Amino acid sequence: MTPRAARPATLALAAALAAGCGGAATEAGAPPSPAGAPGGSALQVPSPWLVADSLDPALVPAGFGTLRQEDVNVRLQYQSLLVRLLPLDESVIRTLSPDAYRTLRELLASRREEIEALSRRYALARARLWLVSFHGIEQGETRFSPLELTVRSGGRDFRPVDAVPLTPGFGEQRLGQRETQAALFVFDGALDVNQPMAITFQTVQSTAWDAILRRVERERSLIRSRAARTPH
């Protein structure tokens, strides 16, 4: 993990995301305007790496989700740290509201070079990316090891191979009260977020993803219904 100066736009974006702001859901029963359709703005993503990820025919269409980021975040508390984790797979983030989806795609596009460099360094045929934030909730300084994270899925343990810092000072591994640090964690592509997962940070484990996955699957069904009712 090599700290580097974060771009001003990325800092503002990371701060909002780390705080759990993922866009509000639309009113019940009212499908959102899809990205690129009237009432929405087209998402411009120049990265072939991102485009390839978004062309999987098994994915639900983009721009019809209503979930908020907090609906799909896994939260863990370890001592004086609050940890939030969000898998950034297309299959997950397409269930979010159009604004939240667009924001996360733009975040990934803004860090494309670092992500691709890490994929080459670790010989990853495909990288799985998670947005992970750490928030200090007690007085005084808290030291932590951000990569002490394990995701167990399909009988295998996955640990992040590296991280792309989104906030300055992430590599210093310490937090003050109410301070937040965030990064994109890079996992091996064999990690399947569409399966149950147990997530462990240090000594604290969460299986909350099982319930989140059921919520995501329900939203996918609703998205298909909304898309089918939308005039082409």
Report each predicted region and the residues it spans.
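Hydrophobic helical h-region of N-terminal Sec-dependent signal peptides
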Residues: L11-A15
